[in-house]
Amino acid sequence: MELKFDDAKLFSYTNSEIFEYISSLPSLPDYGAIVPLSHKYLAKAYATWDEVEDAVSAMKFASQLGIHVPHVHRIVVHDRDFYCIMDRIPGTALDVAWHELGWLSSLRLAFQLRRVVHRLRSAMSTSAGSLPKGRCESYYLEDWFQLPDRATNHHVNAFLNFWASFPGLPREVKKTPAEHATCPRPIFSHNRSFVFTHHDLAPRNMILDPEGQLRIVDWDLAGFYPESFEYAGMHNFLTRGWTRFARWRWNLFSWIAGGLYDKELRWLETIRSRFTHFGAGRRCNMRAGGYASATRWPDNLISD
């Protein structure tokens, strides 16, 4: 017999009963961590409690800024897995709807999102990272050693400048202590407060509801980062199958919504590519106590 989740029993079901629904019902296509329980609720899986805290804190904070976000009604713990039971937003994901939209509709939605982004950016911080712990989970800041929690402008600039000027491992290991002490050609010199950033405004994470309003989902990576990270994050997806006009519309859409940071985007993509291929590239600089030596790992792990 097919299981049917009873919305009225959301708070009376035991964790085990809800897990039975989660394990029995089909997940969303291409989103194995998300299981629709009913037309009203869905369950999203998380691997750690820290991930749950990051996501829930970000959604609560965004809601306090006046942004419509999915409400988390319950957190289910089963063995070592965690599930947030939250609102299922009605509508069509923007990556599906995008191909049917014209220029005028795209512009209208771009200005909608612009208002959301401005509201997010009204919240500022002198340190980077997620709300609960200040953990820098940005995919532009995740080499092997990562940054310390609540990283400062100095830490973030040093990290980005190190990878922007990374000469390759053979040359890096030959640097002198004096060469490790300063960045020869700094590209990044961010000196303003970090702003609250969704950090994954790809079209798959925006729902066009029946009233024509954009609803933002998937706040897992949200935190305080440089302004350019929001714009860059809007290009962090594959446009496979998109026509040239669809890509042009998205470029205009992201510029209106997030501001124009094409130079920063190109550098961030270069930086990400470099530390993806040379994840331990900062080790020599760290051993020398260089300008980019800040990490959240203990010293003994760096010296091993």
Go through the PLM ranges and name each one.
Residues 1-23:
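Juxta-kinase regulatory segment immediately upstream of eukaryotic protein kinase catalytic domains
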Residues 23-146:
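ATP-binding pocket architecture of kinase catalytic cores
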Residues 90, 203, 221:
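Short, glycine/acidic-enriched loop or turn micro-motifs at the edges of active sites
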Residues 106, 119-199:
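An alpha-helical support segment within catalytic cores of ATP-dependent transferases
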Residues 146, 168, 175, 238-304:
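Helical subdomain adjoining the active site within ATP-dependent kinase catalytic cores
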